[in-house]
Amino acid sequence: METSDELKQRIGDLSYEVTQHAATESPFTGEYDNFFEKGIYVDIVSGEVLFSSLDKFNSGCGWPAFSKPIENRMVTNHDDSSYGMRRVEVKSREAGSHLGHVFSDGPKEAGGLRYCINSAALKFIPYDQMEKEGYAQWLTLFDET
């Protein structure tokens, strides 16, 4: 099992603070905020599949925004009353990594939710690398129907 120090060394200080201590990266600074390439986003800690570029949108909030996870079972929601606010925290199911928060002000045509996720909690897997990286089963997400 990976120690805290080993994890911090593998993913970096910011990703460690975000995923393990529920820190928040500064708005408009994350690698994936204004990034719209085709592929999937996985938990930087565990590699578990979380979000698809098909569900990513520009919310203008300063963090990557998604209308939904690839499958609802991939994330867990938790009440968060930190900083005097009432929010819903989003964590990855397997690793329990803090990802961000979910709000009910997303695009109505896509279900009305906005998953506001820290770039530091994510790793992007480009579509053309998904098979090589072990995510071939998710390629069908991008099949045209």
From Swiss-Prot:
The keyword Oxidoreductase applies. The active site is at C116 (nucleophile). One of its GO terms (biological process) is response to oxidative stress. GO terms for molecular function: peptide-methionine (R)-S-oxide reductase activity. Residues 4-127 form the MsrB domain. It catalyses: L-methionyl-[protein] + [thioredoxin]-disulfide + H2O = L-methionyl-(R)-S-oxide-[protein] + [thioredoxin]-dithiol. The keyword Plastid does not apply. PROSITE patterns: MSRB. One of its GO terms (cellular component) is cytoplasm. It comes from the Bacteria. Its EC number is 1.8.4.12. Keywords: Oxidoreductase. HAMAP family: MsrB (MF_01400). Belongs to the MsrB Met sulfoxide reductase family. This is Peptide methionine sulfoxide reductase MsrB. It comes from Streptococcus pyogenes serotype M1. The gene is msrB.
